C-alpha cells in the first residue's frame, strides 16, 4: 500500500526565513522544539491535572500528564509500524506525535473544567470558550514565536491538534440556558462548552484544511447525531489519523495514570475499585482482563510501589497493543482522514470503564468539586473586574491588544485569552490582589 502525501502538509502559514546554520531538522522536529520551549507549555507545570485537597507533591500536573501522553503516543506509533507495516509511510514520525501529545492541553485554563465553564459562561455572548479551541488559538495566533501566526506550526501538525473540526457556531446548542441570577448560583453542567474552533479563528482553520477536496471538507465537519434538545451541543464525527493516535494516548494516560494518582493519594479504596471497575473489567470480553483482574487489584492496593507500577504498566501495555489502524466509515479521499487508530471493541469498553471510574470516584467527588467550584468563582470574579475597567486593570501589553480589537467580542476575547493563560497560582494571587481586604 502506497501513500502519497502532498508537500503542502509540511507548509507553514508564514514562509519563514530563519537564520539557522546547518539546520537539518525535519518540519516536525522543529514543531516539537517550538512547543517544548513555549511559555504556554511551561505553564502546564502549574496547572493541576486532578484538583484535590492533598498537600502531597506526587500528583500529576498538566505538564507531566502531557509528557506521559507523549510517551504513550510514540509507543502506539512504534507498535503500529510493526503490527501493520503497510501503514509505515502514513504514520506520524515520533517528532510529530510527540508534538501533538505535548501540545494537546496547552489551551486548558486554570482550575480545569471549573475554569473552562467559568470562561465559557462569561464569553457566552462572544463566541464561548473551550480548551481545545484555545489550544488551536494559542499555536496559530497567541504564542509569540512569530508576530502574527503563533508558533507557526506545520499544517499536518495543526490538523492533528484539531479534535473537533468544525466551528463552535456549528456545534453549539440552538439555545443557551438562561443566565444565572448570580454567578454563585451557576450550574456548571448547564454551561459545559460546545467543542470546536472559535468562529473568530475561521481563517486559520480554513488554511489548515485548504489542501482537502470539497468532499473531504464537507465530511470532516459532519456531526455524530442530531441533538435531542435545543440546549444540547452537537459533536463532530471525524478526526485525522494523527489526532486519533493522540486522543488514544491522552485517554489511556487519563484512565490509567490518573487512577494511579488517586490510589497513592488515598482518593479511592480497594472496595470502590472492586465495585466500580474490577467486576466490569472482568466482564468486558477481553481475555487479558478476565485472566489478570484479580492480581491487578491486589497489586494496585498492595501498598508497594513496584507492584502498583507493574499493574499500571500491565494495563497500559494491554491497551496499547490492542490498537490497530482501521478504515473510516465514510469515503474520505485524503489518507490522513481515511484511516484512524482504534482500540479493539473489548478493550475500548475496558478503557471506558477506567475513564468512568476515574470520573466518578476521582473527579466528581466533593473534595475535588469544591476546589473546581472555588476556581470557577475566582475566574468569574477576575473576568468581571477586568472587563468592567480594562484600561485601568489590564497589563500594558494586554491593554494594547484590547484597545486594538475592533469589536466588543474581540475585546472580550483578549480578556479571555489573558485569563486562560494564567496558572492556578497566578489566578489565585490576582484574585487576592483585586478582592482581599489584606493589603498585599
Curated annotation (Swiss-Prot):
Tree of life domain: Bacteria
Keyword Hydrolase applies: yes
PROSITE patterns the record matches: HD
Pfam families to which the protein is assigned, alphabetical: HD_assoc
Residue ranges annotated for the HD domain, each copy included: 62-255
Ranges annotated as spanning the membrane: none
SMART domains: HDc
GO annotation (BP), single: dGTP catabolic process
GO molecular function annotations of the record: dGTPase activity
UniProt keyword terms in alphabetical order: Hydrolase
Keyword Hydrolase: yes
NCBIfam families tied to this protein: antiphage_dGTPase (NF041026), dGTP_triPase (TIGR01353), PRK05318.1 (NF003701)
HAMAP family referenced in this protein's UniProt entry, alphabetically: dGTPase_type2
Family statement drawn from the similarity comment of this UniProt entry: Belongs to the dGTPase family. Type 2 subfamily.
Name of the protein: Deoxyguanosinetriphosphate triphosphohydrolase-like protein
The organism of origin for this protein: Vibrio parahaemolyticus serotype O3:K6 (strain RIMD 2210633)
Amino acid at each position: 500500500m502506497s501513500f502519497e502525501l502532498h508537500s503542502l502538509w509540511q507548509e507553514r502559514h508564514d514562509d519563514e526565513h530563519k537564520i539557522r546554520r546547518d539546520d537539518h531538522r525535519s518540519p516536525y522536529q522543529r514543531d516539537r522544539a517550538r512547543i517544548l520551549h513555549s511559555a504556554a507549555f511551561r505553564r502546564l507545570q502549574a496547572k493541576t491535572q486532578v484538583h484535590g485537597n492533598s498537600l502531597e507533591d506526587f500528583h500529576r500536573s498538566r505538564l507531566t500528564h502531557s509528557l506521559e501522553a507523549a510517551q504513550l503516543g510514540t509507543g502506539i506509533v512504534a507498535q503500529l509500524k510493526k503490527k501493520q507495516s503497510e501503514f509505515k509511510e502514513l504514520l506520524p514520525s515520533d517528532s510529530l506525535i510527540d508534538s501533538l501529545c505535548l501540545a494537546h492541553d496547552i489551551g486548558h485554563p486554570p482550575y480545569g473544567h471549573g475554569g473552562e465553564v467559568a470562561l465559557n459562561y462569561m464569553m457566552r455572548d462572544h463566541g464561548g470558550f473551550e480548551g481545545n479551541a484555545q489550544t488551536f488559538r494559542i499555536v496559530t495566533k497567541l504564542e509569540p514565536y512569530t508576530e502574527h501566526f503563533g508558533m507557526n506550526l506545520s499544517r499536518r501538525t495543526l490538523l492533528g491538534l484539531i479534535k473537533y473540526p468544525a466551528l463552535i457556531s456549528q456545534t453549539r446548542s440552538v439555545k443557551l440556558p438562561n443566565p444565572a441570577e448570580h454567578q454563585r448560583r451557576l450550574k456548571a453542567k448547564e454551561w459545559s462548552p460546545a467543542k470546536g474552533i472559535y468562529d473568530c479563528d475561521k481563517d486559520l482553520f480554513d488554511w489548515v484544511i485548504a489542501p482537502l477536496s470539497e468532499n473531504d471538507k464537507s465530511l470532516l465537519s459532519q456531526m455524530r447525531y442530531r441533538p435531542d434538545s435545543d440546549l444540547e451541543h452537537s459533536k463532530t464525527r471525524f478526526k485525522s489519523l494523527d489526532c486519533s493516535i493522540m486522543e488514544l494516548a491522552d485517554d489511556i494516560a487519563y484512565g490509567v495514570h490518573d487512577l494511579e494518582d488517586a490510589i497513592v493519594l488515598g482518593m479511592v479504596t480497594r472496595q470502590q475499585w472492586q465495585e466500580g471497575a474490577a467486576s466490569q473489567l472482568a466482564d468486558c470480553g477481553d481475555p487479558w482482563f478476565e485472566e489478570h483482574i484479580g492480581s491487578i487489584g491486589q497489586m494496585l492496593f498492595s501498598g508497594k510501589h513496584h507492584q502498583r507500577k507493574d499493574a499500571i504498566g500491565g494495563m497500559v501495555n494491554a491497551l496499547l497493543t490492542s490498537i490497530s489502524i482501521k478504515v473510516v466509515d465514510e469515503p474520505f479521499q485524503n489518507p490522513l482522514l481515511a484511516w484512524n487508530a482504534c482500540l479493539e471493541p473489548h478493550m475500548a469498553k475496558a478503557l471506558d470503564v477506567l475513564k468512568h471510574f476515574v470520573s466518578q470516584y476521582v473527579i466528581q467527588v466533593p473534595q475535588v468539586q469544591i476546589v473546581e467550584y472555588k476556581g470557577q468563582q475566582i475566574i468569574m470574579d477576575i473576568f468581571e473586574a477586568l472587563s468592567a475597567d480594562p484600561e485601568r486593570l489590564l497589563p500594558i501589553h494586554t491593554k494594547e491588544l484590547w484597545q486594538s480589537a475592533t469589536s466588543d467580542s474581540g475585546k472580550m476575547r483578549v480578556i479571555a485569552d489573558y485569563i486562560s493563560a494564567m496558572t492556578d497560582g497566578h489566578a489565585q494571587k490576582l484574585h487576592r490582589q483585586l478582592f482581599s481586604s489584606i493589603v498585599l
